Curated annotation (Swiss-Prot):
Protein name: Large ribosomal subunit protein uL5
Molecular function in Gene Ontology: rRNA binding; structural constituent of ribosome; tRNA binding
NCBIfam families named in the record: PRK00010.1
Function: This is one of the proteins that bind and probably mediate the attachment of the 5S RNA into the large ribosomal subunit, where it forms part of the central protuberance. In the 70S ribosome it contacts protein S13 of the 30S subunit (bridge B1b), connecting the 2 subunits; this bridge is implicated in subunit movement. Contacts the P site tRNA; the 5S rRNA and some of its associated proteins might help stabilize positioning of ribosome-bound tRNAs.
UniProt GO cellular component terms: ribonucleoprotein complex; ribosome
Coiled coil: none
Oligomer status and interactors: Part of the 50S ribosomal subunit; part of the 5S rRNA/L5/L18/L25 subcomplex. Contacts the 5S rRNA and the P site tRNA. Forms a bridge to the 30S subunit in the 70S ribosome.
């Protein structure tokens, strides 16, 4: 079992219950899923690019990604309906906790010129979205094996009712927010 999951059950959950005055443990906010999304617009011109993106995403998430396709044709972007334009992975359960642990302890400290995560990236319902400019911050990616540096979106979906609860939950997991 992941260390962060144990930490949540033993310390974080009781602390949040006391802090927000919840009467039941089920009211305490928890992380429901983590979604990783990588847009690969260059895949329209070169099919190999999508294979490399899928390989990188599989290594990072530990789970096979789903290829996302264009919903409608856009002449300006030279894409047609049904063209592969990205990939995404939804992590839940054990893999989610392991990914969160790697993200907080290893990947975020490796971001260049890092000054803390923005607190403005909450959506109003306690969910947090962040962008990563380089996939090489993850230890699973070998620098000499990548074809191109790609970024990705990471969305942490919580059961929190508002941003204050969501932020308290993520801060309890040592998420480095800007002061």
């Amino acid at each position: 079992m992941a260390k962060l999951h144990d930490k949540y059950q033993e310390t974080v959950s009781p602390e949040l219950q006391k802090k927000f005055g919840f009467t039941s443990v089920m009211q305490v906010p928890r992380i429901e899923k983590i979604t990783l999304n990588m847009g690969v617009g260059e895949a329209v011109a070169d099919k190999k690019v999508m294979e490399h993106a899928l390989r990188d995403m599989t290594a990072i998430a530990g789970q096979k990604p789903v290829v996302t396709v264009a919903r409608k044709s856009v002449a300006g972007f030279k894409i047609r309906e049904g063209y592969p334009i990205g990939c995404k992975v939804t992590l839940r359960g054990e893999r989610m906790w392991e990914f969160l642990e790697r993200l907080v302890d290893i990947a975020i400290p490796r971001i260049r010129d890092f000054r803390g995560m923005s607190t403005k990236s909450f959506d109003g319902r306690g969910n947090y979205a962040m962008g990563v400019r380089e996939q090489i911050i993850f230890p699973e990616i070998q620098y000499d094996k990548i074809d191109k540096i790609r970024g990705m979106d990471i969305v942490i979906t919580t059961s929190a009712k508002n941003d204050e609860e969501g932020r308290a939950l993520l801060e309890a997991f040592n998420f480095p927010f800007k002061k």
